[in-house]
């Protein structure tokens, strides 16, 4: 077995994970970063594939005849402090986009602009009338579960038509048990609800505008990594609090005095061997199919669409190339005769489909998209798996706070979306990494 690695820095702190948060912390602090993969960025990474090929390429070839995809689907940078957006732009010049998104009802071939509740005029008079009455006059009592919150917020009609079946798929069936989360994603404004029943309404929500690096997320990750001391191929298997050592899958170890961890909170608890009285909160995994195909005659222009259901089981379809044609092979960018797509399907955490199941699902998804005439010939079908993709909580759960508290007591600072078990975007994750990194910066003379 390799001898332990002794970090060559003053305060003995090391960073686990070179996703966006870990890279930001490493960039701001100068501390070493240990990453499981052989490249930076975590799930916020771009890759390339030639039509008809199964090989992932880390960079585009000179001729540009490749589709660009991302691990885990489209990661668009929304919100964020202006200072953070400037930081991103200096490292990787970015473009700004205005969201184009809809709820799509396949059986009716009906597109309703997002958010649904502000565009009731697209629905039938009967549905529109019921939905208005329920949203504006319904009692707003207490609720414990996401299901109860959805019914209280949107009424039985819209919950039955869209919000219920969508969240059944989005949460892999957990929506009837878990606590409500992220209400700002579906804001309720009575004036806009009424107005939207008869006329157009302005876009609202947390991601009406977003930015994305011109050369892909991998360009941002590489630029950040150049300012960091990143050790690749270091997958954490155990954290020994008594010996103050992190054990890696390759047999090596690293000593520390304190840790900055961006790894998922549940995984960190498991690897430390800590035992909590509270039952762990649930999570869902996501199987994302990245598809490159010739464009179908009914392919929408949306950046992404939400679905109340699909035969194959997916709940969201995103169109990389509708955001920017740079996701297409260079010969198709002027003609826009191809499309680069990501399709999301959720699984309860711990339930991993077999290779055979993934193949069957992939074939069923391609067939369904062809029936909808979104695509014609599929030239690339590439599945990616995100183990901890969405984090949830049980009603009244104190697991998250207890886990963070006990790790802090053992000199572990948890930072980032998955480490702190919250929903936040890339910009906020970079901000948190910079803050924590700066507070742990190596001492230097001014």
Residue ranges and their predicted role:
Residues 21, 39, 266:
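Conserved Rossmann-like nucleotide-cofactor binding loop
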Residues 28-59:
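Glycine-rich FAD pyrophosphate-binding loop
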Residues 3, 394-446:
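C-terminal lid/capping helical subdomain adjacent to the catalytic/cofactor pocket in oxidative enzymes
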Residues 55-139, 165:
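Dinucleotide-binding Rossmann-like beta1-alpha1 core, especially the glycine-rich loop
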Residues 110, 126-244, 252-255, 262:
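Active-site/ligand-binding neighborhood in enzyme catalytic cores
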Residues 6-33:
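N-terminal Rossmann-like FAD-binding beta1-loop-alpha1 element of flavoenzymes
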Residues 256-258, 267-410, 424:
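C-terminal segments that line or cap access tunnels to active or ligand-binding sites in enzymes
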Residues 64, 249-251:
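Glycine-centered tight beta-turn/hairpin loop motif at sheet-sheet or coil-to-beta transitions
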């Amino acid at each position: 077995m390799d001898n332990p690695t002794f970090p060559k820095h003053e305060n003995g702190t090391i960073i686990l994970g070179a996703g966006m948060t870990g890279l930001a912390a490493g960039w701001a602090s100068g501390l070493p970063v240990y990453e499981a993969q052989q490249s930076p960025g975590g799930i916020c990474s771009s890759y390339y594939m030639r039509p008809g090929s199964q090989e992932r390429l880390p960079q585009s070839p000179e001729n540009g005849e490749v589709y660009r995809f991302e691990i885990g689907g489209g990661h668009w940078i929304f919100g964020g402090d202006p200072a953070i957006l400037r930081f991103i732009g200096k490292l990787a010049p970015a473009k700004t986009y205005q969201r184009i998104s809809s709820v799509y009802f396949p059986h009716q071939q009906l597109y309703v602009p997002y958010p649904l509740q502000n565009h009731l005029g697209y629905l039938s008079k009967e549905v529109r009338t019921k939905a208005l009455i329920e949203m504006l006059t319904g009692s707003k009592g207490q609720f414990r579960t996401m299901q109860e919150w959805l019914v209280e917020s949107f009424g039985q009609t819209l919950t039955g038509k869209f919000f219920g079946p969508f969240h059944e798929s989005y949460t892999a069936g957990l929506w009837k048990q878990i606590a409500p989360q992220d209400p700002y994603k579906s804001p309720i404004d009575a004036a806009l609800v009424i107005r939207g029943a008869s006329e157009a309404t302005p876009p609202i929500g947390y991601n009406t505008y977003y930015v994305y690096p011109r050369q892909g997320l991998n360009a941002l990750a590489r630029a950040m990594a150049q300012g960091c001391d990143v050790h690749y191929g270091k997958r954490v298997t155990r954290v020994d609090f008594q010996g103050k050592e992190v054990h890696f899958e390759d047999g090596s170890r690293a000593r520390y005095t304190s840790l900055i961890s961006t790894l998922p909170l549940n995984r960190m608890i498991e690897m430390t061997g800590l035992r909590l009285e509270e039952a762990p909160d649930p999570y869902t995994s996501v199987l994302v199919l990245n598809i490159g195909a010739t464009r179908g005659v009914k392919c929408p222009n949306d950046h992404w669409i939400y679905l109340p259901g699909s035969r194959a089981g997916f709940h969201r379809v995103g169109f990389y190339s509708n955001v920017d044609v740079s996701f297409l092979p260079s010969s198709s960018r002027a003609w826009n005769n191809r499309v680069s797509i990501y399709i999301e399907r959720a699984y309860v955490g711990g339930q991993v489909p077999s290779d055979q199941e993934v193949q069957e699902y992939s074939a069923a998804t391609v067939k369904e998209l062809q029936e909808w005439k979104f695509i014609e010939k599929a030239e690339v079908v590439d599945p990616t798996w995100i183990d901890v993709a969405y984090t949830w909580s049980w009603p009244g759960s104190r697991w998250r706070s207890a886990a963070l508290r006990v790790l802090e007591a053992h000199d572990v600072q948890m930072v980032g979306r998955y480490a702190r078990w919250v929903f936040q975007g890339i910009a906020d994750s970079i901000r948190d990494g910079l803050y924590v990194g700066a507070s742990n910066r190596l001492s230097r003379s001014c």
